[in-house]
Curated annotation (Swiss-Prot):
PANTHER family: PROTEIN NRFC (PTHR43177), PROTEIN NRFC HOMOLOG (PTHR43177:SF3). Binds 4 [4Fe-4S] cluster. This is Selenate reductase subunit B. Its EC number is 1.97.1.14. The keyword Oxidoreductase applies. Residues 84-113, 129-160, 161-190 form the 4Fe-4S ferredoxin-type domain. GO terms for molecular function: 4 iron, 4 sulfur cluster binding; metal ion binding; oxidoreductase activity. Predicted to be exported by the Tat system. The position of the signal peptide cleavage has not been experimentally proven. Its cofactor is [4Fe-4S] cluster.
Length: 292
């Protein structure tokens, strides 16, 4: 019995003294944890109870919930009164490419088809060198050059401002790919990631739901043989969900919402003096804004 009491006492002293040492380095934060450490110290060896609760929400969660509410509020309006825009904070982007990977997964993208690459640049002169990361989705231009060159109108600007592709009409001429000044369009050549293995893996046979249509990639069927591009996950937005790249961004650098809603987070962000758009001099009026 005496041995157990000695063990618990030494454990208590160790934890509380450790908190005191940490307080010297971490200030008020460490001091605020002393009550928690006292509870830990007095707990049984095998059972820890009555811990202080975590906060219900952290800041990044609040941002996600706010955008979710913005999207659902926008959907109460007619589509032609919505203007979907994306805002990307370059100071928060860490170049992890989680948005790129999530987009590939959401849209079941094949090799060579990337809707949201992250462009990496090296800035400065050695040894004062840093890296800059720029996610580059489709700009959903207000005046898109791609729609003007399509000979059959397969690519068009939809009511909510998103530039879309009708896979059933697209003939694969690739004029739109050449016309895009942002390099935001790619072509589906019908390849598979697991093409040179004994069989195509099941995950590549899963359907995607681009533009609200369920499709399975199969030879000789769309979207194989079509131009393809980012569409802000239009199929998710119209169901009240956020774009996949927005929800998976580790740095919370990507935002989406209705530009026409003055209460939306994106409307607030684009009022910042830090805002810029790519190649504005071309007159395309891109609907992707960057915070520098």
């Amino acid at each position: 019995m005496g041995s157990k009491e000695t063990k618990n006492t030494s454990r208590r002293d160790f934890l509380i003294k450790g908190a005191g040492a940490a307080a010297l380095g971490a200030g008020a934060f460490a001091i605020s944890q002393v009550p928690l450490l006292e509870k830990l110290a007095s707990a049984n060896e095998d059972t820890v109870k009555d811990l202080l609760p975590f906060p219900e929400l952290i800041e990044s969660d609040e941002i996600i919930i706010r955008m979710q509410n913005d999207v659902r509020r926008a959907l109460k309006k007619p589509l032609n009164e919505i203007q979907w825009i994306m805002v990307i904070d370059l100071k928060k982007c860490v170049g992890c490419s989680s948005c790129t990977v999530a987009c590939v997964s959401e849209n079941v993208l094949p090799p060579g088809v990337v809707y949201r690459p992250v462009i990496e640049e090296e800035i400065g002169t050695f040894p004062n060198v840093t890296k800059k990361f720029t996610p580059r989705p489709c700009m959903q231009c207000e005046h898109p050059p791609c729609t003007k060159v399509c000979p059959i109108g397969a690519t068009y600007k939809s009511e909510d401002g998103i530039v879309a592709i009708d896979y059933d009409k697209c003939i694969g001429c690739r004029y739109c790919i050449t016309a895009c000044p942002y390099g935001a369009r790619t072509f589906d050549w019908g390849e598979y990631h697991t093409e040179n293995t004994p069989e195509i893996m099941q995950y590549e046979k899963e359907p995607n739901y681009e533009y609200g249509v369920e499709r399975v990639r199969e030879k000789k069927n769309s979207p194989i043989g079509n131009a393809r591009k980012c569409h802000f996950c239009k199929h998710r937005l119209h169901k009240g969900m956020l774009s996949m790249c927005v929800t998976t961004c580790i740095g919370r650098a990507t935002y989406i919402g209705d530009k026409n809603d003055p209460e939306s987070l994106v409307a607030e962000l684009i009022a910042s003096p830090r805002v810029m758009r790519l190649k504005e001099e071309l007159g395309t009026e891109p609907n992707v804004y960057y915070l520098t």
